[in-house]
């Protein structure tokens, strides 16, 4: 894979448990670990954004940085234009967490 390709990485999801009675109290998803080599370009900014149900964001284009996305609640479909001009629809959800990498100079929404 090249640095200009749109990539997806299936993420692990692990239940977390209460320390007293061991009931499941949530989940944890490791998004990035340096030994996994899932992020090809070193992040220079990290932020969280949200989208209300039924709403959309974009399309937009970042000219100087890669973008990485993962859905932590609900479900989202990312739409990105690849090097061939084709549109990709990539789904990520709390049940099926996928890290989406959009390289610079690729339109996405």
Q: What residues fall within each predicted segment?
A:
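Non-catalytic, conserved peripheral segments adjacent to functional cores
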Residues: 1-99
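Well-ordered alpha/beta subsegment
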Residues: 95-109
């Amino acid at each position: 894979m090249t640095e200009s390709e749109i990539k997806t990485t299936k993420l692990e999801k692990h239940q977390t448990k209460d320390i007293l009675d061991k009931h499941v109290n949530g989940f944890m998803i490791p998004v990035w670990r340096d030994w996994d080599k899932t992020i090809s370009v070193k992040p220079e900014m990290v932020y969280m954004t949200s989208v209300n149900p039924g709403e959309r964001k974009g399309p937009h284009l970042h000219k100087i940085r890669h973008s990485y996305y993962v859905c932590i609640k609900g479900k989202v479909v990312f739409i990105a234009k690849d090097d061939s001009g084709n549109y990709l629809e990539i789904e990520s959800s709390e049940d099926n967490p996928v890290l989406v990498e959009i390289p610079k100079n690729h339109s996405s929404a």
